[in-house]
Each structure stands twice: as C-alpha cells, then as structure tokens.
A protein has these predicted regions:
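Glycine-rich N-terminal segment of FAD-binding domains in flavoprotein oxidoreductases
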Residues: 1-29, 65
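Core alpha/beta catalytic barrel or barrel-like domain that forms the active/cofactor pocket
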Residues: 5-9, 68-71, 75, 316-328
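Short glycine-enriched loops at secondary-structure junctions
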Residues: 7-8, 28-30, 137, 259, ...
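Beta-rich nucleic-acid/ligand-interaction surfaces
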Residues: 11-13, 74-78, 191-193
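Short low-complexity, flexible loop/linker segments enriched in glycine and/or proline
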Residues: 17-21, 80-83, 198-200
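Short beta-strand elements
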Residues: 23-25, 101-105, 128-132, 138-147, ...
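FAD-binding subdomain of flavoenzyme oxidoreductases
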Residues: 31-185
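C-terminal substrate-recognition/cap domain of FAD-linked oxidoreductases
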Residues: 168-351
Length: 353
C-alpha cells in the first residue's frame, strides 16, 4: 500500500503498518504556492503546504482561503482536501472540498489533470472521486483553490440560549432562510459550562454575568458562537436578521469578551488532551451528521450509548457545520481510564454507533 502523509493529524490510523508492504509518502518538500490568479480568485498550491503558511502568504497579498478546521495549526492543504475537511466557517463558505477548482493526481493507472472550467455539464465530475478518498485511489500532487479578498469586517460573538433545542431551532431557521452566519456553533449545557469557565469572566464581571443571565432566564443555558465575514454593510444586514431570529428563540447576547476568548483559544482543546491523559482520563471524540428531524434522537442515542458503556462520563456536545437540511454533532468524551483504554474506547464507540 502507498499512504500519503501530510501533517499527521488524522485519527483514522492511515499509516499503521499492516501485514503487507506499506510505503508512506511524506509531502514535507512539496509545500509551495505555485500561482495566484487575482482576477479569477484562485490559488494553485502543492499538497504539503500547511494551512497557516498558506493563509499568511495569501493575506500578504490581500486574499484569504479562510478554511480553518481544528487541525489548522498542523495539518496540510492536501490533507484537508483528501478528507473533505470542514472548517469553522464551513456554513458560510463551504468545506475544503467545496473550494477545490482543479486537481492533479498521480494514480496507479494514470495521471489525472481534473477541472479546466468553472463548471461543466460533460458527465460525472471526476474530482469527486478523489476528494474525500484519503489517498485510496491516488496521490494529490497539485491543488487549485477558490480564494476571496480579505473581509472588510469580521465579527465573532457569543449568545446564550435557554436550551439546546431552542438554539438548534434558531440555527435551523437561519439555514432555511438561506442567510446563516458564516460560523455557527451551539454547545449543549455540559460543554457550555466548560467553555464559559474558560472565557475569561471572573470577579465582579463574573458576578454581574451570573445575575444578568439569571434575570434573563438563561442561566445554565447553551452557549452559541456565531461569526460573520464580508463587506461591513452586508455583515450588518445579515447580523440584524440573525439576531431577530435568535430573539424569537429566547437568546441573550453575551459580553464581547466571550466571542474574543473563543477566537483566541479555539485551538487549545487538543493540547489539554495530553494533560488529561497524564492525569488518568480518557479523552476522545465522535462526530456524525443527520437531518434536522433526526438530530434530537441522534443526540440522545449517542449519549445513552456512551453512558451505557462508560458509566458516568462527561460528554460535551456541540452542533456545527450547518446545512439546509441538517447539521453535524460533535461529541467530546472524558472519563477515567480503564486498565485497557483501547478496549474501553472501542466498546464505547461501538455502543455509540
């Protein structure tokens, strides 16, 4: 087997050696920007370039790709594309694969040069065979991506909904209205408590926050982080519509520090995992997606499965990556380590699945 290796952030054991010869192909030297077409809004890159490196290069020229997943600090663009990575603004700008305009592939049967026009009606789109294939059918050697000018305005803000169901319904309404925020993330009560504890509120500010949320009947509620990017007047109009919807579902705006704290600390969680493991805790994640009508049942079923397998774990859940017909649910599980943590997690994952 030939296995492409980018930043090493995958969690699917793609480079584990099997009972046959396995060759890992690292892309550390294929990390260049090849071209930027400013009129078309398209950048051509090699697959080994990292997300931060590409973003810095584009920003210096007045552009942004804007794809920022949890693994942004270490993963490569080739990895994003090969796994159909979904970043924090996927609701507004699409997943990584939605921004791919051209691909060059080295495959066992032939080399492929895919994507020569903005759109085509000439049969199946062969790019879709390789996007999300995780290297199964060939190796991505070159990628062209749709980029956009740096936004005039960028806003990230926090809200508190009285319940997870209320927040979900508000997000669904924005999706149906076809004017969602570019970034939409809703945490359940368990995850919200952790996030708010890390938001920087303390002392008198924390006391005032607690009194305010109690008065507005959202104490212990569910934290939402929403964000918009673009021309200032467009952001203002979309934001006004969103808040009109949010108010219908009982949402209360939070201090600006909450949104700023999330933006500053959004990549901190994976680093806490090592400390928790050292302290004797298993920390793992699950992700799935479903239609709006099935999300509540999915949420309950996964929680029930995890509790049945692990006893009384801490399970924090957030809803993100909003689509017109549904959304993703992301579960973070923390529980004391068993003597055999691998078997412990396999049993929990099977129960949740």
């Amino acid at each position: 087997a030939v296995v492409p290796f980018g930043g090493g952030t995958s969690v699917v054991d793609g480079v584990d050696v099997t009972d046959r010869l396995t060759v890992g192909v690292a892309f550390w030297e294929m990390n260049s920007v090849l071209d930027l077409d400013t009129e078309t809004g398209e950048v051509r890159v090699q697959p080994g370039i990292g997300g931060p490196e590409l973003e810095r290069w584009l920003e210096a020229r007045g552009f942004t790709w804007g794809h920022i997943p949890q693994s942004w600090e270490r993963a490569t663009v080739g990895g994003y594309v090969a796994t159909r990575s979904a970043g924090q603004t996927s609701t507004g700008f699409g997943r990584a694969d939605a921004t791919v305009t051209k691909l060059r592939i080295a495959a066992p049967v032939a080399d492929f040069d895919l994507g020569r026009a903005p759109g085509t009606a000439a049969g199946p789109d062969l790019k879709q065979v390789f996007l999300g294939s995780e290297g199964s059918f060939g190796i991505i050697t070159e990628i062209a991506l749709r980029v956009r000018p740096l936004p005039e305005k960028k806003v990230y803000e926090g809200l508190l909904f009285p319940s997870f169901v209320a927040g979900k319904r508000a997000f669904r309404q924005l999706a149906l209205d076809r004017v969602p925020a570019d970034m939409m993330r809703l945490s359940d009560a368990e995850e919200s408590a952790v996030n708010l504890a890390m938001s920087g509120l303390s002392g008198i500010t924390k006391q005032a926050f607690d009194r305010y949320t109690a008065l507005r009947k959202v104490a212990g509620g569910c934290l939402a982080i929403v964000g918009w990017e673009g021309p200032a007047d467009v952001v203002a109009a979309r934001r006004a519509h969103a808040y009109a919807v949010f108010r219908q579902f009982g949402a209360v705006r939070l201090p600006a520090t909450v949104g700023r704290s999330w933006e500053k600390n959004r990549f901190a969680a994976p680093y806490l995992r090592d400390d928790l493991l050292d302290a004797g805790y298993l920390v793992e994640t699950l992700e799935t997606a479903n239609e709006w009508s099935q999300l509540d049942a999915t949420y309950d079923a996964v929680h029930d499965g995890l509790r049945g397998a692990l006893g009384d774990p801490l399970v924090g859940t957030h809803l993100s990556h909003i689509y017109p017909t549904g959304a993703s649910l992301y579960f973070t599980v923390i529980t004391p380590l068993a003597d055999d943590p691998v078997a412990q997690w396999k049993a929990a994952k099977a129960a949740a699945t």
